[in-house]
């Protein structure tokens, strides 16, 4: 008799609610601005209060308090202050980044070719650009709108969550070698179509822009298709497209993020690099924010930066003064919420830096079953196998033995499996925000991250079980770091 043995749920499948919540997070975080907005909502729902860099924090930040601050709407730092915090005490820090490789709409995007309305785009980061062809593309980001009553420019988030644009490939009949080598010009052939030109389109546009007023640069209607502007205006419920002053918009795969695989062991989505770490560090902090906070002598802090994919050198990137400035403010904060005096402050920030630890979290390369020879033979991370500790002798990653011992202890206490990764000697190695912040602050640092396949594709693959593993690890790190940091000193 022929029998079929049904498999039980795979051990690599996560039984928690985190995978479904992560998918929802991904589907509402199509730009760094939306990502930070969603992190803010989660923090506020867990009792965190917003601060501003423009204000003094004296009297506003106190022991047992929970706070967050944003910069540019695309980077965010959140922290919980221990009940026994004093200047000079340690800070447990996790770091991630909010950006991903993408196509960004150019300042003057209006293009027309062969009666097609096209949108000029600029490549951002090092994506696998061929993966963007033949995808239904949505548009999301930040729009500045003029308030008719006050005259102020107001930033609004917009997500045109519909199949709006497409970059079509050339038919195989016209390119017989396409399956041997797919080549294209990123300036002229990585250009999406958005509609068909009508004879009245140009006349309508000229009428709208010919109002006789002086403008320092081309008007918004001269720079972008009125059809695109009209969709933005409708989404934001504003009266006229002329109220749109400028925008920062990126394209994304409209195909929704989802769980997949025989047992939902996979997450199929864009932007896993690095919204994975944003999501897990966010949950790790909020889960630990109130745990024995009365007895906590340190601060528990998470940072999510913009612009990692292009080197981090911006006002809101990891190479900026954003984190150092926050550490500076916290290092002059006395237990009663007032500020320290200058001489004490200088010593305190040095002591805090020496005692603190930074977990730089960015996704890692999972072993690819079809290209296993591309990996170092003894370091092949598996999806569902837990967070990956990344090591590089040339300091592309910051992991060293003291840090590894520390994280190993935390993982064992939290029952979290870990994996190790180094690149093969004949392969290039990427990097993270870890080396940038380690050299900038002198804070001890370790690089780790959850494994993914197809990194920098428009559609990546992660492991659903790894989400809970990393959240548990971060929670353990926040809760226990100050009690064990003195045990591993070099």
From Swiss-Prot:
Binds 2 Zn(2+) ions per subunit. It is found in: Cytoplasm; Vacuole lumen. Zn(2+) 2 binds at residues 273, 309, 456. CDD domains: M18_DAP. One of its GO terms (molecular function) is metalloaminopeptidase activity. Transmembrane segments: none annotated. Keywords: Aminopeptidase, Cytoplasm, Hydrolase, Metal-binding, Metalloprotease, Protease, Vacuole, Zinc. Zn(2+) 1 binds at residues 97, 273, 308-309, 362. InterPro entries: Peptidase_M18, Peptidase_M18_dom2. GO terms for cellular component: cytoplasm; fungal-type vacuole; fungal-type vacuole lumen. Its cofactor is Zn(2+). Substrate binds at residues 173, 308, 362, 365, 390, 397. NCBIfam families: PRK02813.1. Tetrahedron-shaped homododecamer built from six homodimers. Belongs to the peptidase M18 family. This is Aspartyl aminopeptidase 4.
